[in-house]
């Protein structure tokens, strides 16, 4: 893994810093093309050191894997920057909920939390949501850990338990989330989610239902594909209906009343039954969110034993890319006025169609290497590519796998597409970056180069 390799070869930092400094000279375009500051090439700190983040100190240990590239993004809060496309989506959803769901005194039923710290405990991110200790979503290769006890949240669901425990029963949470992932136009290590939760008391759920006073929220039975063991079928079906109706109205508000929707059964550790919503957009079915009836064990542990509820989570980038026809997720981090001014509208519901910036030519280079005998994770390589290449890297494709018939060693060949969003890249500058990546892969990942 990157961490163990760094601890074995800390001297490699000095070389990479020197190399990166050479590459970055003469590149002054801060929005997209400049190499990160030289120190950012050191992807982790050794155990015993401390990382300062958002005014707090976090001791490093063998679980720490937060890259400096990601650290520079923490606190940007794109969803709170006025007229940013992610802010527009958030405001449209918030406006819809404020208008459609009103409490007894005319105030909004749903409260909104859009400035919660992205640093959470592993208990908040996993255990509070009933995610098993051996669940693959906990893997170091998929998350950004500050240390064994703290991490950058992988989903806004990490705040569900705390808000329920505080006595809230209807709320939206919006924030940046962090996951180690592949590199292409649809994936970025930081993206933004909007989470919603609503709980119902027996009176609230069955109000207006004929003979509703005789119905119950809970029973002791067996779990099935349609309900949890503690829920009555009547309660589950009403919660499911309210959830799907709420989301159908939201999507109609965003995309128009003629939108075609379908529901797909799925699995999440913290809801059952669980669903994904797909929309038919220009003839293509697109998955836009996940949702379900909240696991009663989670609700009970937060102190709301007399209530049943639903939850959903959607990606703001996903919706914005569909609604505004934005082709590349990197654009959300662009500071180019040609991008941002397209979303400076007086009415948040005004239709916007993104006008592409000039498409500069790509520079494509391949990298091949033999994998180490153990501890290689593909997301470690992707993280290294992002750290060395920054936002110049448009995508990375694994184009070939080969197992040597005699040594049984495995070789990977990746095709890396470099493209600047604001100017043409030269072969020379890409060659310097690519060479630094090759050397970093050998020294930090323990691979054997085939270049």
UniProtKB/Swiss-Prot annotation:
InterPro entries: aa-tRNA-synth_II, aa-tRNA-synth_II/BPL/LPL, Fdx_antiC-bd, Fdx_antiC-bd_sf, Phe-tRNA-synth_IIc_mito, Phenylalanyl-tRNA_Synthase. The gene is FARS2. This is Phenylalanine--tRNA ligase, mitochondrial. It catalyses: tRNA(Phe) + L-phenylalanine + ATP = L-phenylalanyl-tRNA(Phe) + AMP + diphosphate + H(+). The keyword Protein biosynthesis applies. Substrate binds at residues 157-160, 179, 186-188, 193-195, 287, 312. GO terms for molecular function: ATP binding; phenylalanine-tRNA ligase activity; tRNA binding. Belongs to the class-II aminoacyl-tRNA synthetase family. It comes from Homo sapiens. GO terms for cellular component: cytoplasm; mitochondrial matrix; mitochondrion. Pfam families: FDX-ACB, tRNA-synt_2d. The keyword Transcription regulation does not apply. Is responsible for the charging of tRNA(Phe) with phenylalanine in mitochondrial translation. To a lesser extent, also catalyzes direct attachment of m-Tyr (an oxidized version of Phe) to tRNA(Phe), thereby opening the way for delivery of the misacylated tRNA to the ribosome and incorporation of ROS-damaged amino acid into proteins. Its main location: mitochondrion. Residues 358-450 form the FDX-ACB domain. GO terms for biological process: phenylalanyl-tRNA aminoacylation; tRNA aminoacylation for protein translation; tRNA processing. Keywords: Acetylation, Aminoacyl-tRNA synthetase, ATP-binding, Disease variant, Hereditary spastic paraplegia, Ligase, Mitochondrion, Neurodegeneration, Nucleotide-binding, Primary mitochondrial disease, Protein biosynthesis, Transit peptide. Its EC number is 6.1.1.20. Changing residue 329 to T: In COXPD14; results in a 4-fold decrease in the catalytic efficiency of amino acid activation mainly due to a decreased affinity for ATP; does not affect Phe binding; affects the stability of the enzyme, leading to a significant decrease in overall charging capacity. It is linked to Combined oxidative phosphorylation deficiency 14: A severe multisystemic autosomal recessive disorder characterized by neonatal onset of global developmental delay, refractory seizures, and lactic acidosis. Biochemical studies show deficiencies of multiple mitochondrial respiratory enzymes.
């Amino acid at each position: 893994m990157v961490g163990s390799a760094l601890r074995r070869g800390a001297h490699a930092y000095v070389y990479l810093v020197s190399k990166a400094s050479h590459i970055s000279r003469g590149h002054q375009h801060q929005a997209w093309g400049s190499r990160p500051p030289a120190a950012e090439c050191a992807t982790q700190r050794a155990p015993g050191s401390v990382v300062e983040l958002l005014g707090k100190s976090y001791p490093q240990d063998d679980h720490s894997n937060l890259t400096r590239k990601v650290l520079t993004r923490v606190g940007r809060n794109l969803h709170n920057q006025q007229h940013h496309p992610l802010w527009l989506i958030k405001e449209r959803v918030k406006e819809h909920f404020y208008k459609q769901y009103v409490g007894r005194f005319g105030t909004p039923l749903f409260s909104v939390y859009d400035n919660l710290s992205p640093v959470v405990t592993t208990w908040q991110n996993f255990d509070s949501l009933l995610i098993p200790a051996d669940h693959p979503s906990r893997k170091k290769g998929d998350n950004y850990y500050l240390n064994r006890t703290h991490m950058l949240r992988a989903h806004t669901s990490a705040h569900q338990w705390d808000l329920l425990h505080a006595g809230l029963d209807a709320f939206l949470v919006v924030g940046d989330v962090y996951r180690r992932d592949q590199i292409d136009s649809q994936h970025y290590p930081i993206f933004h989610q909007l989470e919603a939760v609503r709980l119902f008391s027996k009176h609230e759920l069955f109000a207006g239902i004929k003979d509703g006073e005789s119905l119950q929220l809970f029973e002791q039975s067996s779990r099935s594909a349609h309900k949890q063991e503690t829920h009555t079928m009547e309660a589950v079906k009403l919660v499911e209906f309210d959830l799907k109706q709420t989301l159908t109205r939201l999507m109609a508000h965003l995309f128009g009343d003629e939108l075609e929707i379908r529901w797909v059964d799925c699995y999440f550790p913290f809801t059952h039954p669980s669903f994904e919503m797909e929309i038919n957009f220009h003839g293509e079915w697109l998955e836009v969110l996940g949702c379900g009836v909240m696991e009663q064990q989670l609700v009970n542990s937060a102190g709301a034993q007399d209530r049943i509820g639903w939850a959903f989570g959607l990606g703001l980038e996903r919706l914005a890319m569909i609604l505004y026809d934005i082709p590349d997720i990197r654009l959300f981090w662009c500071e180019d006025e040609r991008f941002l001014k397209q979303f400076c509208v007086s009415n948040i519901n005004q239709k916007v169609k993104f006008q592409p910036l000039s498409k500069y030519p790509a520079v494509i280079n391949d990298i091949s290497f033999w994998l180490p005998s153990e501890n290689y994770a593909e997301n470690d390589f992707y993280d290294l590519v992002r750290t060395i290449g920054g936002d110049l890297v448009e995508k990375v494709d694994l184009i070939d796998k080969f197992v040597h018939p005699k040594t049984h060693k495995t070789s990977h060949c990746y095709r890396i597409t470099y493209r600047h969003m604001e100017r043409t890249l030269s072969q020379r500058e890409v060659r310097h970056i690519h060479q630094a990546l090759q050397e970093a892969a050998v020294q930090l990942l323990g691979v054997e180069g085939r270049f």
